[in-house]
């Protein structure tokens, strides 16, 4: 009902109005970067400080895992879940690539049953720390630079997405030398 009053609170007009039901659409947003402090973004994978993380790696004949830190930021106005996809280049088939929770040991899973690894529900304004791990068995080596493009995409609207790139620059350690002088004369 609508009522109009005068200065002495006497009803001047009273009428019935229509009821309208409407939904306020919340905006969605995501940023995937390397910052634990803010949701800065330099665009899709490029050489910007928030979008390209590089590590050097030397293969020395032992098994190892290299990890990169990431943060998925919900920059929207509603709780959302973000599917995580990965495109890799120059990665040998013997290497195992995994996405982990912040502890670097617990694998991320598919929390909503759509078949894609995701962040789980993330409230507006919050971030989730994740890690990319690349495991190399002892006999798995490469001298190629490897790129890993990770994309976080909203499950509510798949057009809402953001990507970042990790680069691993590899070299081989071809062996070790140990010089030993058995007669202690100092002559080689």
Go through the PLM ranges and name each one:
Residues 1-58, 153-188:
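Extracellular/luminal low-complexity Ser/Thr/Pro-rich, glycosylation-prone repeat/linker regions
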Residues 29-31, 89-103, 157-158:
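Short aromatic-acidic-glycine turn motif
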Residues 64-68:
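Structural beta-strand segments of beta-rich domains
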Residues 69-73, 133-135:
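Short edge beta-strand/loop segments characteristic of extracellular beta-sandwich folds
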Residues 71-76, 188:
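Asparagine-centered strand-capping/turn motif at beta-strand->loop junctions
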Residues 77-94:
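Short acidic, flexible loop segments centered on an aromatic residue
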Residues 102-139:
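Intrinsically disordered, low-complexity Pro/Gly/Ser/Thr-rich segments with frequent PxxP/GP/PP motifs
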Residues 138-149:
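Short glycine/proline/serine/threonine-rich loop/turn segments at secondary-structure transition edges
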């Amino acid at each position: 009902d609508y009522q109009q009053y005068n200065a002495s609170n006497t009803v001047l007009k009273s009428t019935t109005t229509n009821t309208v039901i409407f939904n306020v659409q919340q905006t969605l947003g995501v940023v995937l970067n390397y910052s634990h402090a803010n949701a800065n973004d330099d665009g899709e994978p490029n050489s910007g400080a928030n979008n390209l993380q590089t590590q050097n790696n030397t293969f020395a004949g032992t098994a190892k895992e290299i990890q990169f830190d990431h943060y998925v930021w919900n920059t929207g106005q509603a709780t959302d879940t973000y599917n995580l996809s990965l495109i890799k280049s120059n990665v040998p088939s013997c290497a195992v690539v995994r996405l982990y929770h912040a502890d670097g040991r617990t694998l991320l899973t598919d929390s909503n049953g759509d078949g894609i690894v995701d962040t789980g529900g993330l409230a507006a304004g919050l971030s989730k720390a994740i890690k990319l791990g690349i495991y190399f068995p002892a006999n798995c080596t490469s001298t190629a630079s490897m790129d890993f493009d990770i994309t976080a995409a909203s499950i509510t609207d798949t057009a809402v997405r953001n990507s970042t790139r990790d680069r691993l620059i590899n070299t081989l350690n071809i062996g070790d030398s140990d010089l030993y002088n058995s007669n202690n004369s100092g002559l080689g």
